[in-house]
From Swiss-Prot:
PANTHER family: K HOMOLOGY DOMAIN-CONTAINING PROTEIN (PTHR11208:SF153), RNA-BINDING PROTEIN RELATED (PTHR11208)
Domain called KH: residue spans: 141-208
Name of the featured protein: KH domain-containing protein At2g38610
Residues with the N-acetylserine modification: S2
Species assigned in the record: Arabidopsis thaliana (Mouse-ear cress)
Phosphoserine, modified sites: S263, S273
Length: 286
């Protein structure tokens, strides 16, 4: 029986929060935080229908990130002193010209803002820099001039926008398509150009990746989103375009499922589960 109670290889939130018990090694906390993030990303499409689960996960993520020592002090200092420089963290992103994308100029421009106070109640160091939420925005230029016939927007969106949704669910970041050609209807884009809120339509086609996450993980997630998007948008020969073939198969599967759903069934009723919601969120400039 003693073996059941003396095993310290599992992370215990109660043990970590107790001042009387030595917390688990940082590597266990890091692994646990990774698992929490994975759960959070799976829950992302259902946050509106499961708000309590989402809130509890967020609380636990902030608590665990607050226990991880010596992480994010640079972000904490910038938050505290309100650095005006948009390039405060020059080492945030590597130069994406090394990715083999000729003409792809990744601009590591970032905007940093912090929320120095949280409404969540958890037992952790209140001044821990890892507990602060940091907002970063990364802009990636799309090389439309070098590849004028390549459908960058359609490739990023994927069937029913699913490719873009998966990027967001995997990384916890939000991705926006901006600039000329970001609106599907050219006539609508011409009408909107110059209006307030659509100034980006005068710019070259580009992508904005937005991360609003704890300081200890925001850079990792932003890099992850950048790598996925660059791989997704890398122009390749059609005969070797595995991503396009995969998207076409997914579209065919979705269309066949729609045909089955539209066919009258014996019960005449569909599922009322909120998880079957097909709500769409616009990702382009419209």
């Amino acid at each position: 029986m003693s073996g059941l109670y003396n095993n310290s290889s599992y992370f215990s939130p109660a043990r970590a929060a107790s001042p009387q018990i030595r917390s688990t090694p940082e590597i266990d906390s890091s692994q646990y935080l990774t698992e929490l993030l994975a759960e959070h990303q799976k829950l992302t499409p259902f946050m509106q229908v499961l708000p309590i689960c989402s809130r509890l996960l967020n609380q636990e993520m902030f608590r665990v990130s607050g226990m991880m020592s010596n992480q994010g002090f640079g972000d904490f200092d910038r938050l505290r002193h309100r650095s005006p420089s948009p390039m405060a963290s020059s080492n945030l992103m590597s130069n994406v010209s090394n990715t083999g994308l000729g003409g792809w100029n990744g601009l590591s421009q970032e905007r940093l803002s912090g929320t120095p106070g949280m409404t969540m109640d958890w037992q952790g160091a209140p001044g821990s820099p890892s507990s602060y939420t940091v907002k970063r925005i990364l802009r990636l230029e799309i090389p439309v001039d070098n590849y004028p016939n390549f459908n960058f927007v359609g490739r990023l969106l994927g069937p029913r926008g699913n490719s873009l949704k998966r990027v967001e669910a995997t990384t916890g970041c939000r991705v926006f398509i901006r600039g000329k050609g970001s609106i599907k209807d050219p006539e609508k884009e011409d009408k909107l150009r110059g209006r307030p809120g659509y100034e980006h339509l005068n710019e070259q086609l580009h992508i904005l990746i937005e991360a609003d996450l704890p300081a200890s993980i925001v850079e990792i997630r932003l890099r992850q989103a950048q790598e996925i998007i660059e791989e997704l948008l890398k122009p390749v020969d059609e005969s070797q375009d595995f991503i396009k073939r995969q998207q076409l198969r997914e579209l065919a599967l979705l269309n066949s499922n729609n045909l089955r759903e539209e066919s009258p069934g014996p019960s005449g009723g569909g599922s009322v589960s909120p998880f079957n919601s097909s709500g769409k969120r616009p990702k382009t400039g419209c």
